[in-house]
């Protein structure tokens, strides 16, 4: 399928039986879009924030979330090669670099001797960053999204 070649992260995704009837999805949409529409931000339907690794679109597993917040959870798997999330190897320095990208900016977090050390620095920084954004948006997002962000764990296998 051509769409899966362009966006392989959706390859194994499914839609719940209930939402295969568009009027059921439309009703859910209209009830939940109000939670987020009152804020002057672009928003997206997300399947991964409430349940990490989720592949099913359903009323229990997805939520509307501001686009900026959703961008915190992209993992760049197709672009990062053999290294964990937030890590690349600098051939000139011969070190592993911990790096976080957000809103088009790269934040260099340090150079390390091992992949694991670089990843741990990235993990610590990114989890704190997600918590900071959650706190800043606490009054703008549903509590279930806030709680998911406050409890988010980044793993070396992500």
Where does each model-flagged region fall?
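Active-site proximal helix-loop segment of RNase H-like, two-metal nucleases, encompassing DDE(D)
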Residues: 1-2, 97-107
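Residue-level signal for secondary-structure boundary elements
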Residues: 2-3, 37, 130, 134
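Short, cationic Gly/His-enriched loop motifs
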Residues: 5-95, 99-100
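Structured segments of extracytoplasmic/periplasmic soluble domains
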Residues: 28-32, 125-128, 132
């Amino acid at each position: 399928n051509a769409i899966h070649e362009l966006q392989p992260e959706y390859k194994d995704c499914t839609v719940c039986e209930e939402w295969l009837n568009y009027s059921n999805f439309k009703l859910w949409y209209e009830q939940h879009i109000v939670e987020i529409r009152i804020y002057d931000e672009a928003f997206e339907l997300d399947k991964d924030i409430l349940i990490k690794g989720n592949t099913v679109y359903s009323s229990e597993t997805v939520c509307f979330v501001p686009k900026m917040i959703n961008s915190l959870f992209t993992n760049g798997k197709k672009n990062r090669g053999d290294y964990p999330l937030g890590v690349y190897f600098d051939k000139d320095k011969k070190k592993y670099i911990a790096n976080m990208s957000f809103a088009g900016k790269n934040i260099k977090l340090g150079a390390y001797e091992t992949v694991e050390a670089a990843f741990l620095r990235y993990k610590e920084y990114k989890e704190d960053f997600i918590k900071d954004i959650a706190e800043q948006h606490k009054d703008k997002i549903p509590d279930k999204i806030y709680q998911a962000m406050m409890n988010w764990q980044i793993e070396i296998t992500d």
